[in-house]
A protein has these predicted regions:
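C-terminal helical subdomain
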Residues: 99, 121-154, 158, 165-167
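Short C-terminal tail/terminal secondary-structure segment
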Residues: 15, 64, 148, 159-172
């Protein structure tokens, strides 16, 4: 990763079905995932050396229809499209832009962003796992490995892609 600068940005958003989602929920999700990302990258660009790498956090929900995830999924689809557009905008500076889309990852997020009880979160995790071809949720270190790859010289000819790290969840 010689000389590579990387900007990996956080994700946010709570889950709410269309029937009960509020304008505040929608605004918070888009303010963090779309507006916050856009202006953070804009302000960081003057600090980037030519030839750097920007890695955006999207989600497999950007290509899946998941009940309750509509606003979140739409915000992550916007993130995915930032990678496409910024790839073209930043090509003259040789800054590569990619997005990484995790699937179901074994973190506390399921319990903390959905309002589910611990027992309900475990049941949901088991249901997610049953829908993943690899039969399990991913590990945080697997996400880290994917981001490390995208930031490395080994991915020097990769830009504009959305790397799904999802155990096949959104692929089949």
């Amino acid at each position: 990763m010689t000389g590579v600068q990387t900007c990996a940005l956080p994700i946010s958003g709570t889950i709410a079905p269309l029937a009960v989602a509020t304008e505040a929920h929608f605004d918070q999700t888009f303010d963090v995932n779309v507006k916050g990302l856009f202006f953070t990258v804009q302000k960081a660009l003057p600090l980037f050396k030519d030839g750097g790498s920007i890695i955006l956090n999207s989600s497999v929900s950007n290509v899946m229809g998941l009940p309750g995830f509509t606003a979140y999924a739409a915000s992550k689809a916007a993130v995915r499209n930032f990678a496409r557009g910024w790839t073209m905008e930043l090509k003259d500076r040789k800054i590569r832009v990619n997005s990484m889309s995790p699937g179901a990852i074994d973190t506390p997020a399921l319990a903390t962003t959905t309002g589910l009880t611990a027992e309900q979160a475990e049941q949901a995790a088991a249901q997610f796992s049953s829908q993943i071809p690899m039969g399990r949720r991913g590990k945080p270190e697997e996400i880290a490995a994917a981001v490390t790859f995208l930031a490395s010289d080994e991915s020097s000819f990769i830009t504009g892609v959305d790397l799904a790290v999802d155990g096949g969840m959104a692929q089949v």
